[in-house]
A protein has these predicted regions:
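Alpha-helical elements of Rossmann-like donor-binding domains used by nucleotide-donor carbohydrate transfer enzymes
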Residues: 99, 132-135, 204-208, 243-248
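Short, acidic/polar
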Residues: 13-27, 89-107, 161-170, 241-250
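Distinct, well-ordered alpha-helical segments
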Residues: 18-23, 46-50, 127-130, 156-176, ...
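Substrate-binding cleft of secreted/luminal carbohydrate-active enzymes
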Residues: 4-12, 58-60, 64-65, 100, ...
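Substrate-binding cleft of extracellular glycoside hydrolase catalytic domains
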Residues: 40-163, 179, 188, 237
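A structural motif corresponding to the C-terminal end of an alpha-helix
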Residues: 103-112, 136-145, 173-179, 209-221, ...
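Boundary/entry segment of secreted carbohydrate-active catalytic domains
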Residues: 1-42
């Protein structure tokens, strides 16, 4: 029997009413929960403080966004389109890491919280991104920080993307340092009325990653589904949503490598 892996994705504004109660109740019952937040550190801070006292292994992920930072730098994606870094993913990683570290909240708990440094990146640049991820994970390790990458859009990348030399190198690093380097994925159905549409092409796509790892004799990485749900702007009514959540939760429960999955979204207009 495994605990429910489904948690929530939150951010600035929005509708996090009740999230504190949700966290306290589960923590009190010693049940791990999953929480992802972008830009707004408050909910993660609350969760990490609970964790310090209880030692329940909650899954906490934080990301800094371009929109949230609003300083002219693109925090969402690496500088892979910058001519200076087109052939230098390691240099791109160093720049991106410097920028990210400068924005990291002082309360960030390096022991308990995963940092997600990029989001919905270019599926055609897998080898570049794999090399970028290796350097990022090594820079993070020096700072005592845990990272989870790449937060691919639902339906991406192509399975062959995982087999590029850079990606395989990152997957081997994850296998070597599972407590410090992990893989982040997004899984949406893009439909409100059929959560398993085209399964496992969208929801369930993590299985392609595992197949590639198995093929190359690489232990499967720790996985965070840092966004999942129906569509970007809508969720179905509770009588439809709850069974969908249960069914997707049962799918993820079968794979011990999946640590948590954050429902999109406790944000504005939801």
């Amino acid at each position: 029997k495994v605990p429910n892996k489904i948690g929530f994705h939150t951010g600035p504004g929005g509708n996090p009413t009740g999230i504190g109660d949700f966290m306290k109740k589960l923590d009190g019952a010693r049940i791990p929960f999953c929480l992802k937040s972008v830009d707004h550190y408050g909910p993660i801070f609350e969760a990490q403080e609970l964790m310090k006292k209880s030692n329940v292994p909650h899954v906490l992920v934080f990301r800094i966004s371009t929109r949230g930072a609003n300083d002219g730098y693109d925090y969402d994606v690496p500088p892979y389109k910058d001519p200076k870094y087109v052939n230098d993913p390691e240099g791109g990683a160093e720049k991106h890491w410097r920028k990210t570290m400068a924005k990291l909240p002082p309360e960030f708990d390096r022991k308990r919280v995963w940092l997600e440094p990029i989001n919905e990146v270019d599926k055609d640049l897998c080898d570049w991104l794999g090399r970028f991820a290796v350097r990022t994970a090594n820079l993070a390790q020096k700072e005592g920080i845990k990272v989870t990458l790449f937060a691919w859009s639902s339906g991406e990348p192509e399975p062959s993307g995982w087999e590029t030399p850079g990606m395989l190198k990152y997957l081997r690093l994850c296998a070597k340092r599972p407590h410090q380097a992990a893989v982040a994925l997004h899984e949406y159905s893009y439909l409100e009325n059929d959560i398993f549409d085209q399964f496992p092409f969208k929801i369930g796509r993590f299985q392609y990653l595992f197949q590639i790892c198995d093929k190359h004799n690489i232990p499967r990485p720790r996985v965070h589904i840092t966004e999942w749900g129906w569509t970007l702007n809508t969720v179905p009514p509770p009588e439809k949503a709850i069974p969908d959540i249960r069914n997707v939760g049962e799918l993820y429960a079968r794979f011990p490598e999946i640590e948590g999955a954050a429902i999109w979204y406790l944000g504005p207009a939801f």
